[in-house]
Curated annotation (Swiss-Prot):
Cited NCBIfam families: baf, PRK13318.1-5, PRK13318.1-6, PRK13321.1
Locations listed in the record: Cytoplasm
Ligase listed as a keyword: no
Cofactor-binding details, from the entry: A monovalent cation. Ammonium or potassium.
MF annotations from Gene Ontology: ATP binding; metal ion binding; pantothenate kinase activity
Residues binding K(+): 129
Protein name: Type III pantothenate kinase
Binding site for substrate: 100, 107-110, 184
Species the sequence originates in: Geotalea daltonii (strain DSM 22248 / JCM 15807 / FRC-32) (Geobacter daltonii)
GO biological process terms held by the UniProt record: coenzyme A biosynthetic process
Major place of residence: cytoplasm
Family named by the database record: Belongs to the type III pantothenate kinase family.
Known catalytic reactions: (R)-pantothenate + ATP = (R)-4'-phosphopantothenate + ADP + H(+)
Length: 256
C-alpha cells in the first residue's frame, strides 16, 4: 500500500492507495509546532481506527508547501516505517515541462495537480485549487505547465475583513440567503461569497482568452464544492485530484 501526504498551510491530507484505488483518506489541521513523534502518534491512531497495520505501507510520497514540516514527515517515514519517502521537488520526475521563469518557485501542490489533471483529461486545463491561497494553473494541450495566478484564499479574505474592520464580526463562510442582505452577517457573507465567485470567473475567463485553447476548468480543494455550483466557468470538481497526482508521480518515479 502507498501512503500519500499533501501538506498545505491549513490542512494536511493523507490517503492510502491499494494499487490505483484510494481506500482511505483523512484531513487534519496543519500544526507547525508538532514534532515527528506527535505526528507519528497521530498517524498511528488514524491507522488504528481504520484497522490498517503500519506494516502494510510499502512506500510514502509527500507534497509539502510548509518547508518546516517536510523534514518532520521525512523523519516520520524513516522512524516509523523504516524507509525514505519520495518528496515532490527537485529530483522528482514529473513527466511535464514547466514553463516558469524559475521552475523551483512553483508550489509542489500546483505541479501535482497539473500532472493529475492532464493524466486524467489529456486536454488543455485550468485547475483552480481552493486552499489557504487559491491557485489558478494552466496546462496546455501538449501537457506543458504554463503558469498561472495566485489569489488570497476565502479564509484569508474573511479574516482580513474581520481583523481590519473593528465593528465586523467573524462569520461562517457560506452562501447567504440573498446577495441583497438584510443584516451584517449576511452582508459579509454575500460580499465574500459572491465576490469570490466573481474573482474565480473573472480570472478563469481572462486565462481562457489568453490561452485560446478552450481549456477544461476543474476545481479542487476544501472549498471547491461551495464555490463551484455558483461559478459559470468551473466544469468539474475533483476532490481527490492532489492525492491522485501524488499516486501518479510515485508510479512514474518508482518505475524509472
Amino acid at each position: 500500500m502507498l501512503l500519500v501526504i499533501d501538506v498545505g498551510n491549513s490542512n494536511i491530507v493523507l490517503g492510502i492507495y491499494d494499487g490505483d484505488s484510494l481506500v482511505r483518506d483523512w484531513r487534519v489541521s496543519t500544526d507547525k509546532s508538532k514534532t515527528t513523534d506527535e505526528y507519528g502518534i497521530l498517524v498511528h491512531e488514524l491507522f488504528r481506527l481504520a484497522g490498517i497495520d503500519f506494516s502494510r505501507i510499502t512506500d510514502i510520497i509527500i507534497s509539502s508547501v510548509v518547508p518546516t514540516l517536510t523534514g518532520v514527515l521525512e523523519k516520520l517515514s524513516l522512524q516509523y516505517f523504516d524507509f525514505k519517502p519520495y518528496v515532490v521537488g527537485p529530483g522528482i520526475k514529473t513527466g511535464m515541462s514547466i514553463h516558469y521563469d524559475n521552475p523551483k518557485e512553483v508550489g509542489a501542490d500546483r505541479i501535482v495537480n497539473a500532472v493529475a489533471g492532464y493524466e486524467k483529461h489529456h486536454t488543455a486545463l485550468i485547475i483552480v485549487d481552493f486552499g489557504t491561497a487559491t491557485t489558478f494553473d494552466y496546462v496546455n494541450k501538449r501537457g506543458e505547465y504554463c503558469g498561472g495566478a495566485i489569489a488570497p484564499g476565502l479564509m484569508i479574505s474573511m479574516e482580513a475583513l474581520f481583523q481590519k474592520a473593528s465593528k465586523l464580526p467573524r462569520v461562517e463562510i457560506t452562501k447567504p440567503p440573498a446577495i441583497v442582505a438584510k443584516n451584517t452577517v449576511n452582508s459579509m457573507q454575500a460580499g465574500i461569497f459572491y465576490g469570490y465567485v466573481g474573482l474565480v470567473d473573472g480570472i478563469v475567463t481572462r486565462m481562457k482568452g489568453e490561452g485560446k485553447e478552450n481549456p477544461k476548468v476543474i476545481a479542487t480543494g476544501g472549498l471547491a464544492g461551495l464555490i463551484a455550483p455558483e461559478s459559470t466557468t468551473i466544469e468539474e470538481v475533483d476532490e481527490y485530484l492532489t492525492l491522485e497526482g501524488l499516486r501518479i508521480l510515485y508510479q512514474r518515479n518508482r518505475e524509472s
